[in-house]
Structure formats: C-alpha cells, structure tokens
C-alpha cells in the first residue's frame, strides 16, 4: 500500500478515463457540446449541456428525466444494478453522483496551458530550448514556423498552439538528454577565456536536463502539457440556483465554461464551410484567451469576461490562497480530538513543554478522564464522572495533570510548509485561554505573538504516541531538514532582552560616588530583591578566589602596616543573573 501522494501531468487518455463512461448499449457519454444550461420553458437541464443528466446523473434520486421510472424504486426494487431509461438514456441512481461525475470539452486543436507558459521559470521555453519572449510571440500568433517537405520546400505555416504542439511532438526525450550531456561537456572549453558565458550556458543546460529527467522518470510525454480535453467539474461544485422571483444565479465557472464551448463550436462550424486557416486565426486566438481566463483570470490585462466591473473567479483563484480549496477545506478541516487557540509567549517553560488551556484539556481528554476517575474511585459511573468534569471539581485537575505528565500533544501552525510545522510537546495545564509556547521554537513554526493561532491534536494509537514521543518532539527537531541550519534561534526580543540585562549604567554618579560593595554574590541578589539596587547598577564584588580566576598571572600583595589589599570586580546584577543562566544551561 502506497502511503504518499504524487502529482504529475495527466495524459489525454487519463482525462478521458475520468470524464467518459459507456452505457449498457455501448454508447459513450461525457462530451459537452451545448453551451445552454437550462431549457427556457421547462427550466430542466439541456442534454449535452453543462447540467446534462445523461453525463452527470439525474437531479432527483431514483428518477429519470422523462419520469418513466419515477415510482419504480419506491415499491422496494433492489438498486444493485445499472438501469438506464430507454427513452431519455438517463441512469436511474442516487443524485449524489452529480457531486463527483465529470464531463469534458473536446477542443478543436490542442491549447497551451497557461501555467507552463506564464509561470517562472517558463517550463515550455526550457523544454523547447527557446527564449521566453519568442515562445510568447508564437503562442499569441505574432510569429510562425514553416512546414517543409522532404525536398525542403515550404508547404505551409503554423502559429499559435498548433506550432507549439508540432515542436513538442517531435521531441525524443532519450535523444535530447544525450545531446544535452554532450553539449554540457563541450562548453568546458569556454571556461578559460569566457567564464561568464560558460556559467550562463551551464545553468541553461542543467535546468533543461533536470526538466527532461523529470519527464523521463515519470513516463510523461512533452505533448501532455497541452490541453486536448478540458475537464468539466461536477455540477454540484458549480451550482445553479433558482430564486423565488424566477432569477437564476450561477457561479463564475459556468460563465467561463459557456464561453469556451461557444468558441469551440464556432470554430467547428467555420471549418465546415472549408474556410482557409488564415480567416480563423482570430477565433483560435479568442479560444486560447477563453481557456486562459478559465485557468487563471488574473494575468489577462484586457479581460472581456467581466461582470459588474469585476473579473470572474477562475479555477486557480478557487484553489490558491488562504480561502482556497486546499488550505480552507482540505488542510484546514476540523477533525476530532483537536482544538485551536491563540499562542502567547512563556519563557519559563522548557523547550519540550507547552501550556494547554484548562477548558481545551478537559474537553480533549474527556474519555481518558472518565476512565481515570472511575479507576481511582472518584466516580461510580460515566454519568457521575461527566458531572465532576463539567463542574471542574477539586480532584479533577490533579487527575488531569497526572494524565498530561505521561502524554504528548501535537501543535500545528498553518500553513504547514515543511515537517517542522507540526511538533509534539508535553502539555502543562494553564488557567488562561491561550496556548503557552516557548519563544525558541517559534522560528521553526514561523510564528510570532501578534495573534497567531495554532491547532492542538491528540494522538490516540500507541504507534502515533510513540512517534510523537520520539520523532516529533521539539528537542529532536533542532535543525532544518532542507539545509541543516539550526531551527532553534533566538528572536529579536530575546536578543534585546539579553542586551538589556547585561547593559551597564555608565553614569559617573554610579561609577565614582555611589559605590556598592558586597562580599559575595548572595548578598548582591538579596539587595536586588529588596529593591536597594537596580538591574543595571554597578556593584563592586570582592573576589575571594582570585588565584583560580587569574591562574596564569602573578599578583603581588604588598604589606604595609599589616593592611591586606583586596581585589574587586565591577559588574552588574543583570550580568550575574545572565552568568547563572548560562552556567545552568551548560
């Protein structure tokens, strides 16, 4: 069983396997040919349209389009076989199938995917070995390529997506990578007399080799980056709603699909009139713009698909960002045994500890607490234990602390861009509403204390508990997996705090007149706690063990009238505290 997800380019046959299916009589359905959605009189879905019941399934459970099988399944017939109406060819089944069944638009010619053209780096230009501006000129039909026969004579020209498709179809990946390796070895001669050009060519060839290797390893053909069949999302994901006043509203994706189907059908009709290809260049360019607007509507400067001075929401906008499908619905979904709260700093915690609010702890560890209360004879049954937990009795918190002492929880901060975005900590009960976090682990989470929130997850199985205790614990994740640099770094406020603690008050009044002399460190700390000195006040401390400190130097003590000369050190109480913390850490 594979425990990973791999994303790669889908072939046209793979897209057809997603979107096309066959009826019991052998008829293939799935292709959308009609840009109409609802019949203007009956308000029912049009066959071959964006809401077609033949392609996506019936709109009502166990009922076909014409109503022939309306009462059949209400009488208790078994629904363990595929039944298709002989009149309307609609499958009689559950209407929930309209949530996952897809259709497709058979494009007249392969179109360019805007992600591979307008992204950085431009993978289309890298694969073809051309400049980005030249590729864009050809895509927007500002340049062309000539088609020659075996005799070298020009028999036609190609431009736009058809020219790109012609170039990609002629690429042999095995021969291309062998050629690139030879060129990479051949440019070594440039290193001696033109080093800058050598570096530029070397980077260019290495990037192209990496891309070609990725295509070879995933068994992907270069022509697959062109769009042959455009998938159409299920109708329930792009709903059409009818209001009480008869107004029909629908999502922006439906408008974009309508434009694509209309432009595609228009080119098909023009070809039936046997018009020269030169007369259809404008329609081809228009169809390319419509598909680009469907995929990503932001990069189109002059957008003809605007409603109320607002661009239509493309499929890319529905996927990316904080409110996109991934972060909002897939990665950020609510799961059982989890909580969420704001994080605040608590430097008194250990590196592997975190503060957990009492309300969250009582709710997440509710079943375990019930079991422990019954085991320790605090409660007779489950109902009594729940009442004690709800009232937060005096003996509940000690039992909860005993449970948390041997338990580890997972803290996650979205977005989880690398594996350090989720780590395990030993929880400590706090009577606040926020999660307490050690400031040193914030750099791994990319978190700060300006309102960031973190999620709490409880591992349940023994395997997950062992993994949280050994692998995910914060003290075992001190380096970044990408480059090996330390992930536990002091933040700016910690550096400023160390600077403030070790700062000296250079006022001459403190240095020369108000001399504070103490016999040992304990008396200095006692004076600070009594409020006699400040944290940056100079103090003079008698050095009683100076031979151990100045081991390699000779100190001469002169006796004059039996008076012993002492050695003093000038320091501050802040430096004494800082030195104690360093010694305790070491």
Curated annotation (Swiss-Prot):
Cofactor descriptive note: Binds 1 Mg(2+) ion per subunit.
Coarse class of the protein's main subcellular location: plastid
Catalytic activity: RNA(n) + a ribonucleoside 5'-triphosphate = RNA(n+1) + diphosphate
A single Gene Ontology CC term: mitochondrion
Family label: Belongs to the RNA polymerase beta' chain family. RpoC1 subfamily.
Subunit structure: In plastids the minimal PEP RNA polymerase catalytic core is composed of four subunits: alpha, beta, beta', and beta''. When a (nuclear-encoded) sigma factor is associated with the core the holoenzyme is formed, which can initiate transcription.
Biological function: DNA-dependent RNA polymerase catalyzes the transcription of DNA into RNA using the four ribonucleoside triphosphates as substrates.
Name used for this protein in its record: DNA-directed RNA polymerase subunit beta'
Organism per entry: Euglena gracilis
């Amino acid at each position: 069983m594979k425990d990973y997800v791999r994303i790669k380019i889908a072939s046209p046959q793979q897209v057809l396997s997603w979107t096309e299916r066959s009826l019991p009589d052998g008829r293939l359905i799935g292709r959308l040919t009609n840009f109409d959605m609802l019949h203007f009189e009956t308000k029912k879905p049009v066959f071959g349209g964006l809401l077609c019941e033949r392609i996506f399934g019936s709109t009502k459970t166990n009922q076909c389009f014409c109503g022939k099988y309306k009462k059949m399944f209400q009488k208790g017939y078994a629904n363990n076989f595929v039944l298709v109406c002989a009149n309307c060819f609609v499958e009689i089944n559950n209407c929930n199938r309209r949530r996952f069944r897809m259709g497709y638009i058979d494009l007249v010619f392969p179109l360019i995917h805007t992600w591979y053209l307008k992204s950085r780096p431009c993978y289309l230009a890298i694969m073809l070995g051309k400049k980005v501006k030249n590729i864009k000129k050809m895509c927007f039909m500002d340049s062309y390529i000539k088609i020659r026969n075996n005799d070298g004579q020009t028999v036609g020209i190609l431009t736009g997506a058809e020219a790109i498709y012609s170039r990609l179809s002629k690429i042999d990946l095995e021969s291309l990578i062998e050629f690139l390796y030879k060129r990479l070895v051949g440019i070594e001669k440039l290193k001696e007399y033109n080093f800058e050009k050598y570096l530029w060519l070397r980077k260019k060839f290495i990037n192209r080799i990496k891309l070609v290797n990725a295509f070879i390893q995933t068994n992907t053909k270069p022509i697959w980056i062109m769009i042959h069949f455009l998938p159409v999302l299920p109708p329930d994901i792009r709903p059409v709603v009818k209001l009480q006043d008869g107004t029909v509203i629908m999502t922006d994706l439906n408008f974009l699909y309508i434009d694509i189907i209309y432009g595609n059908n228009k080119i098909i009709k023009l070809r039936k009139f046997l018009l020269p290809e030169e007369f259809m260049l404008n329609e081809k360019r228009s169809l390319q713009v419509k598909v680009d607007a469907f995929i990503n509507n932001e990069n189109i400067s002059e957008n003809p698909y605007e409603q109320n001075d607002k661009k239509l929401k493309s499929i890319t906008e529905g996927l990316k960002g904080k409110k996109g499908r991934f972060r909002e619905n897939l990665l950020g979904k609510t799961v059982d045994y989890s909580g969420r709260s704001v994080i605040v700093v608590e430097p008194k915690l250990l590196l592997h500890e975190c503060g957990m609010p009492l309300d969250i702890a009582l709710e997440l560890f509710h079943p375990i607490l019930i079991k422990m209360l019954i085991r320790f004879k605090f409660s007779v049954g489950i109902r009594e234990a729940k009442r004690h937990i709800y009232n937060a009795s005096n003996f509940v918190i000690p039992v909860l602390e005993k449970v948390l002492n041997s338990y580890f929880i997972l803290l996650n901060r979205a977005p989880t861009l690398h594996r350090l975005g989720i780590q395990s900590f030993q929880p400590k009960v706090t009577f606040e509403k926020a999660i307490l976090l050690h400031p040193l682990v914030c750099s791994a989470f990319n978190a700060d204390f300006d309102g960031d929130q973190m999620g709490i997850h409880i591992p349940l199985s023994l395997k997950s508990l062992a993994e949280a205790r050994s692998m995910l614990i914060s003290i075992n994740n001190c380096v970044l997996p990408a480059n090996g640099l330390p992930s536990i770094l002091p933040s700016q406020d910690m550096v400023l705090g160390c600077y403030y603690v070790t700062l000296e008050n250079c006022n001459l009044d403190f240095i020369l007149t108000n001399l504070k002399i103490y016999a040992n460190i304990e008396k200095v700390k006692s004076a600070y706690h009594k409020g006699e000195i400040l944290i940056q006040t100079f103090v003079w401390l008698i050095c009683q063990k100076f031979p151990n400190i100045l081991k390699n130097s000779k100190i001469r003590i002169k006796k004059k009238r039996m008076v012993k000369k002492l050695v003093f050190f000038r320091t501050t109480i802040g430096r004494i505290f800082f030195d104690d913390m360093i010694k305790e850490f070491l």
